[in-house]
């Protein structure tokens, strides 16, 4: 199919030969492209928007041919949630509870512990009793929760189960990751305490039998040799891994002898005095299950937070503990049964998984929340986990492991089981628990059946829709000579899109002002058969229907008229162009603006297009909606502001303008052609006189310019040093030749200099207003000291001789004078007084207001300058960063053309006459002066931050972290040589004001850059398991 623009031209080509009054139904159908050939499938890469008969590429390809049944629904196969044969059951991660899931799976595979828990009886139900069917079972104690969880893990049909009841009973925060080793200790203590109330000794003592061992702290006095023992129980051995490579090295260090000397000497009861001694740990007995905690998470003294040690530790599958025991004649060979892994390089984030051996088959499994993976063969495989946790390329390479040994930098707990030749236990689920499991299995089966039925119904509906769409699409094209309807292409596409159910048909957006189909909307419409249209309107409703009667003859006739006028315009443009080449003699021509001549064709086209748009608005509606009054008024205003033909030579008084460069004479023939298109254009014969009022104003303007130039020259000559800012007096070093100096506003001096530089552009300065420097009581707002320092930029000092000239040239409202009085006999000492005198009350109020403004600000800019190691940080380094040549900057600004000046420096009032500063505007004026004089110029390695006075230093450090990638605990901040250390203090209380420059010195970055992700969590106080059931709350 031809491109869209070609189809547009072809649809209206008949207008070249057919006048508007001769338009027939055949022409109307041509305009609406009814007769275009429909496209065949395979001939179009995409739908032809210019052809309403093209029904290819509208989404039909999805429905033609065979369709996969899964596309008719978005329901996953419920059997994917079913437990596979001989597979273990996973546990849902509730947010950050993966550390809990790993321990639950490990304890579940401790068959002795599982059996003891099954035998545990509760207050409500003795072991062996059934639960009433009409009552939902809700575990009350920790033991009951574990019983129910273990029973589900053993016999559930689900692929994974939800441990939220157990987690909720402990009161754990599911969104906060906790210390897994601490959780293990606290839960074992809680479980032991809970089981101690059981009558059955096998249940009551199961924790001690499985996990409890004994060791003794043995202290030997070096003086008398007396040996003292302190026997203690342990449930795990906490082994330091720093500086070690093998597990046996860690155990050796744990049992290493320690010397007690100096201040740490031991008080010997035999010697009755402090003596040097040795202390060590002796292992007395070991449990059946030996838990070895590898201390991967340690406290970092430099940062004040925990960090993870990514040290590789080697360990074997068989561990002989006999060399470490006090008594050597026992059985102390242990087999590896579980390895608990922490993925990640930070102590505050990451993911926990567990590798646990099945005690019945000897096979290894990886437990990762809902997902459980069986290892190939019967060997433990840790290599993949170590690769996943690779923090950086700089880490130590993984050492080679021999047969039966492993090494890991992510293992934080190793569990060994005492080697035995006895067969493993066969643990059966008690009847009352099995009944609960069966109930849950029944619910799961019901859910699976519901999901399967929903899938089946969705597939059935999809197949019906498939056949329906195939049939309707075959009958969708309208055959030649048959009744037809136009329908929205967008609606058709939504009908073919299964993801969005179609809404009622809405054709209102395609209507013209006459309530029929707009010819320009044909590109978003499609012509379909009446049969399919009837089906659509019956099923989905909507409207209005757009059949053959909806083709708008009025719109087609009007478009025909406008197109013919545009064609005529092209011919007239050529004629006028040739006529303009003819020289006009005498007074037979007409004045036409040059700008109008350049754009008359475009203006005529726009005029024709406006007529086309007016036709759409003719009945007060556009696409069925009445236009907004505000929109109509806005359009009228825009039309008034637009240039109309020949108005570019009309002066403000409605007469011919005086500038002959903006107009030219055209012949009568050319003007007649132009007048056809612009009948209301102003007409000026070539003998027409220019506007007399404009001539008078022109002469007056020239006279004013000459007067202003003369004034500027006179004032510059009289006050030459003031204009050039040369030989100016200074209060800090009072000139010897005079005892009086006068003060004027610096604002006055700047405005006056602008006028002198550009007298034809700027208004003359006729008055000198000093009221801005005085308070409402008429007193001076500045002290002598302040005028030599911070307030010096607000005033200008004037010599007495200059003051005399100023009084002659300008109207002065207030005289401000400073007088020096020398003491008799002491020419070096002098007193300074001002007229008018200082107003202490208002001066104090001004200072308070200034300080308050500096301490109370929002969204102000400060600058952070990062200092590298090789640059010395001086106490006064911060002020140096603010140094900028403000005077040179101002001079450059003055020399710029108007409109290009920096608004921070340009204080002129847009060329208007200077207005006096009132007292109320004094403060804002002063702020402008301060801003101009202390304008900050950013330097390399510096970034601007938006801050408020009430935010804390800690919050500022977080902003700095995002800007410079420096963690808060690595930031050293200084301002004016003072270290900022109180994280809870506000910026206002620390003396940080707008435009301050803070120096940032970063400590050496930690090797683990991923820890940056945990800065927010690091900065929060660590509460551990406070408030949970593990601590008895």
Swiss-Prot record:
Protein name per UniProt: Ubiquitin carboxyl-terminal hydrolase 48
GO CC annotations on file: cytosol; nucleus
Gene Ontology BP term (one): regulation of protein stability
Ranges for domain DUSP: 457-552, 567-690, 710-823
Cysteine-cysteine disulfides: none
The entry's keywords: Cytoplasm, Hydrolase, Nucleus, Protease, Repeat, Thiol protease, Ubl conjugation pathway
EC number(s) recorded for this UniProt protein: 3.4.19.12
Chain's gene name: USP48
InterPro entries named among the record's database cross-references: DUSP-like_sf (IPR035927), Papain-like_cys_pep_sf (IPR038765), Pept_C19_DUSP (IPR006615), Peptidase_C19 (IPR050164), Peptidase_C19_UCH (IPR001394), Ubiquitin-like_dom (IPR000626), Ubiquitin-like_domsf (IPR029071), Ubl_USP48 (IPR044743)
Residues in Ubiquitin-like domain copies: 931-1007
Catalysed reaction, written as an equation: Thiol-dependent hydrolysis of ester, thioester, amide, peptide and isopeptide bonds formed by the C-terminal Gly of ubiquitin (a 76-residue protein attached to proteins as an intracellular targeting signal)
Chief location of this protein within or outside the cell: cytoplasm
Secretion signal span: none
Organism from which the protein derives: Gallus gallus
């Amino acid at each position: 199919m031809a491109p869209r623009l070609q189809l547009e031209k072809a649809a209206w080509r008949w207008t070249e030969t057919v006048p508007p009054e001769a338009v027939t139904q055949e022409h109307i159908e041509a305009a609406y492209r009814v007769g275009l050939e429909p496209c065949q499938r395979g001939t179009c890469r995409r739908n032809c928007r210019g052809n309403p008969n093209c029904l290819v590429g509208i989404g039909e390809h999805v429905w033609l041919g065979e369709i996969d049944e899964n596309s008719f629904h978005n329901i996953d196969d419920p059997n994917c949630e079913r437990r596979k044969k001989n597979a273990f059951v996973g546990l849902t991660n509730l947010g950050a509870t993966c550390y809990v899931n790993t321990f639950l799976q490990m304890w579940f595979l401790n068959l002795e512990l599982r059996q003891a828990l099954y035998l545990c009886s509760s207050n409500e139900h003795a072991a062996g009793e059934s639960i009433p069917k009409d009552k939902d079972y809700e575990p009350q104690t920790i033991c009951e929760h574990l019983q129910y969880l273990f029973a589900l893990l053993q016999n559930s049909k689900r692929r994974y189960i939800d441990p939220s009841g157990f987690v909720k009973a402990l009161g754990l925060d599911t969104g906060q990751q906790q210390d897994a080793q601490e959780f293990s200790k606290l839960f074992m203590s809680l479980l032991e305490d809970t089981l101690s109330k059981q009558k059955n000794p096998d249940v009551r003592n199961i924790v001690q039998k499985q996990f409890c061992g004994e060791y003794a702290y043995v202290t030997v006095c070096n003086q008398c040799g007396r040996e003292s023992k302190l026997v203690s129980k342990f449930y795990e051995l906490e082994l330091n891994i720093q500086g070690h490579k093998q597990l046996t090295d860690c155990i050796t260090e744990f049992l290493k002898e320690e010397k007690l000397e100096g201040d740490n000497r031991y008080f010997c009861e035999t010697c009755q005095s402090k003596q040097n001694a040795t202390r060590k740990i002796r292992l007395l007995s070991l449990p059946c299950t030996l838990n070895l905690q590898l201390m991967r998470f340690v406290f970092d003294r430099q940062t004040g937070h925990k960090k993870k040690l990514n040290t590789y530790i080697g360990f074997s599958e068989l561990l002989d503990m006999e060399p470490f025991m006090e008594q050597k004649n026992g059985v102390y060979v242990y087999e590896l049964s579980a390895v608990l892994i922490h993925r990640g390089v930070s102590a505050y984030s990451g993911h926990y998984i567990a590798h646990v051996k099945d005690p019945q088959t000897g096979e290894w499994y990886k437990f990762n929340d809902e997902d459980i993976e069986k290892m190939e063969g019967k060997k433990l495989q840790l290599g993949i986990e170590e690769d996943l946790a690779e923090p950086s390329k700089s880490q130590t390479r993984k050492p080679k492991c021999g047969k039966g040994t492993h090494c890991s930098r992510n293992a934080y707990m190793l569990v060994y089981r005492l080697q035995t030749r006895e067969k493993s236990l066969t643990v059966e689920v008690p009847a009352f628990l099995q009944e609960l499991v069966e109930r849950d299995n029944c619910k799961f089966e019901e859910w699976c059946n519901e999901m399967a039925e929903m899938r089946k119904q969705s597939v059935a509906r999809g197949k019906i829709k498939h056949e329906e769409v195939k049939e309707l699409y075959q009958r969708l094209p309208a055959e030649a000579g048959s009744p037809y309807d136009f329908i929205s292409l967008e609606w058709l596409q939504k009908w073919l899109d299964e993801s969005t159910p179609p809404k009622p048909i809405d054709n209102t957006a395609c209507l013209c002002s006459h309530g029929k189909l707009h010819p320009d909307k044909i590109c978003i419409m499609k012509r379909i058969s009446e049969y399919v249209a009837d089906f659509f309107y019956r099923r989905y409703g909507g409207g209005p229907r757009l059949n053959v009667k909806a083709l708008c003859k009025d719109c087609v006739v009007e478009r025909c008229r406008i197109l013919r006028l545009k064609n005529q315009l092209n011919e007239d443009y050529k004629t006028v162009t040739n006529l303009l080449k003819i020289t006009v003699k005498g007074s037979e021509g007409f004045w036409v603006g040059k700008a109008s001549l350049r754009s008359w064709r475009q203006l005529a086209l726009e005029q024709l297009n406006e007529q086309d748009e007016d036709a759409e608005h003719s009945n007060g509606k556009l696409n069925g909606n009445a236009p907004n009054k505000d929109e109509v008024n806005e359009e009228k205003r825009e039309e008034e502001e637009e240039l109309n033909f020949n108005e570019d030579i009309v002066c403000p008084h409605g007469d011919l303008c005086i500038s002959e460069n903006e107009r030219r004479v055209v012949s009568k023939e050319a003007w007649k052609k132009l007048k056809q298109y612009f009948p209301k254009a102003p007409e000026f014969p070539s003998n027409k006189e220019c506007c007399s009022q404009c001539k008078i104003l022109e002469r007056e303007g020239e006279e004013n310019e000459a007067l202003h130039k003369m004034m500027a020259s006179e004032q510059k000559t009289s006050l030459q040093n003031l204009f050039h800012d040369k030989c100016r007096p200074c209060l800090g070093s009072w000139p010897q030749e005079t005892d009086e100096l006068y003060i004027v506003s610096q604002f006055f001096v700047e405005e006056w200099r602008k006028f002198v530089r550009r007298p034809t552009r700027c208004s003359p300065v006729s008055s000198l207003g000093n009221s801005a420097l005085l308070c409402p009581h008429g007193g001076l707002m500045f002290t002598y000291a302040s005028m030599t320092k911070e307030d010096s930029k607000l005033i200008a000092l004037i010599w007495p001789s200059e003051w005399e000239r100023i009084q002659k040239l300008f109207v002065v409202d207030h005289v401000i004078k400073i007088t020096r009085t020398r003491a008799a006999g002491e020419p070096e000492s002098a007193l300074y007084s001002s007229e008018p005198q200082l107003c202490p009350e208002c001066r104090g109020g001004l200072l308070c207001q200034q300080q308050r403004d500096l301490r109370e600000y929002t969204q102000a800019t400060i600058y952070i300058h990062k200092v590298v190691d090789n640059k010395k940080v001086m106490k006064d380094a911060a002020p140096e960063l603010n140094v900028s040549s403000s005077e040179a900057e101002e001079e450059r600004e003055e020399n710029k053309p108007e409109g290009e000046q920096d608004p921070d420096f340009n204080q002129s009032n847009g060329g208007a006459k200077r207005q006096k500063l009132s007292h109320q505007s004094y403060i804002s004026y002063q702020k402008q002066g301060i801003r101009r004089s202390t304008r900050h110029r950013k330097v390399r390695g510096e970034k601007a931050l938006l801050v408020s006075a009430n935010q804390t230093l800690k919050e500022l450090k977080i902003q700095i972290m995002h800007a410079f990638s420096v963690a808060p605990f690595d930031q050293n901040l200084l301002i004016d040589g003072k270290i900022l250390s109180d994280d809870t203090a506000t910026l206002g209380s620390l003396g940080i004001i707008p435009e301050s420059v803070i120096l940032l010195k970063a400590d050496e970055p930690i090797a683990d850059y991923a820890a940056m992700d945990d800065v927010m969590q690091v900065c929060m106080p660590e509460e551990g398991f406070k408030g949970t059931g593990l601590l008895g709350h």
